[in-house]
A protein has these predicted regions:
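Canonical Radical SAM [4Fe-4S] cluster-binding loop centered on the CxxxCxxC motif
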Residues: 9, 18-55
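Short, charged low-complexity linear segments at domain edges
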Residues: 2-21, 196
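Conserved AdoMet/S-adenosylmethionine-binding subsite of the radical SAM
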Residues: 62-74, 83-209
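Conserved alpha-helical substructure of the radical SAM core
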Residues: 41-75
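Residues that line or immediately flank small-molecule/substrate-binding pockets and catalytic motifs
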Residues: 14, 42, 79, 128, ...
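A secondary-structure boundary/capping signal
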Residues: 27, 78-79
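Class I S-adenosyl-L-methionine
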Residues: 11, 24-27, 195, 226-229
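Short acidic, glycine/proline-enriched helix-loop-strand junctions
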Residues: 163, 201-230
C-alpha cells in the first residue's frame, strides 16, 4: 500500500533544522493552529485532492532520498504540523528503512499522535508557543493542555529533543517568559532555545513593522535552566 503524505515543500539540504546534522526537511501540509509569527503561511491549509503541479509526492521523494544515501544523515518532518497527517508514521518507517535518522518538528497539538510517532524518531524540535494557559493568544486556538501533555510524553520517552520558542515583544512579555521558564523547569527540561522573530514569510503586518529589539535580560541567567538565544 502506497504511503500518502501531503507535502508542501522540501529543503533538500539543511544544517539548521536538526542542529549538527545535514538533513533533508520535508514540509508537511496543514496545521490546526494560526500563530501570528508563522513564516510558512502557505502550509496552513489542509489541501485535499491530487497534488498540485510541481508538488512532491512521497513516492517521488523516497526515490530522491534513495539516491542521497551516504550524503544526507537524516530526514526531518516539519510543517505545518506533521503529526496531523495519517501517513506520517509510515513515511518515517520508510525513511528509517533507507538508513536515515528521523527528526520531527512539532507543537504537540494531539498528544496521542505524538506518542505514536515517538518510537520512530531520533530527535524532536518541540515548539513551545506560550505559557500553557495563554496558548490561544499565540495560536488562535485552544491547545495549552495538549502541549503540556505532549511535552511530558516527550520528556518521558527519552528521545533527544530541543524545546524552542519564537519571541517577539508584542507576543510574549517578560512575565510570560518567566512563567514559561518555570513551567519548563517543573517539567524537567534543562535547556530552552529562544528564537528571535524574523519577518521573512510572516503575513502579520503588525509584527513585521516592529523590530523585536534587544532580548530581555530577565532570562539571560537562570539557575536550573540553560537559556539559549538565537
Amino acid at each position: 500500500m502506497t504511503t500518502t503524505l501531503r507535502i508542501g515543500g522540501l529543503e533538500k539540504f539543511s544544517t539548521v533544522d536538526w542542529p549538527g546534522r545535514l538533513v533533508a526537511t520535508v514540509f508537511c501540509q496543514g496545521c490546526g493552529w494560526r500563530c501570528r509569527y508563522c513564516h510558512n503561511p502557505h502550509l496552513l491549509s489542509f489541501r485535499v485532492g491530487a497534488p498540485l503541479e510541481g508538488e512532491w509526492t512521497w513516492p517521488a521523494l523516497v526515490a530522491w532520498l534513495r539516491d542521497r544515501r551516504g550524503l544526507l544523515e537524516g530526514v526531518v518532518f516539519s510543517g505545518g504540523e506533521p503529526t496531523l497527517q495519517a501517513g506520517l508514521t509510515a513515511a518515517m518507517r520508510e525513511a528509517r528503512d533507507l538508513g536515515f535518522r528521523v527528526g520531527l518538528h512539532t507543537g504537540g497539538p494531539v498528544p496521542a499522535l505524538l506518542a505514536a510517532a515517538l518510537p520512530l524518531v531520533d530527535w524532536v524540535g518541540f515548539d513551545l508557543k506560550a505559557p500553557f494557559e495563554h496558548y490561544f493568544r499565540i495560536t488562535g486556538r485552544p491547545g495549552g493542555e495538549a502541549a503540556r501533555s505532549s511535552l511530558q510524553l516527550l520528556r518521558e520517552s527519552g528521545v533527544e529533543h530541543e524545546v524552542r520558542t519564537t519571541w517577539h515583544p508584542d507576543l510574549l512579555g517578560e512575565q510570560d517568559l518567566m512563567d514559561m521558564a518555570g513551567e519548563l523547569e517543573q517539567a524537567g527540561s534543562r535547556r530552552w532555545v529562544l528564537q528571535v522573530f524574523r519577518p521573512d514569510g510572516c503575513a502579520d503586518e503588525g509584527l513585521r513593522a516592529r523590530s523585536p529589539g534587544d532580548v530581555p535580560e530577565v532570562l539571560l541567567a537562570r539557575e536550573g535552566l540553560e537559556v539559549v538565544w538565537r
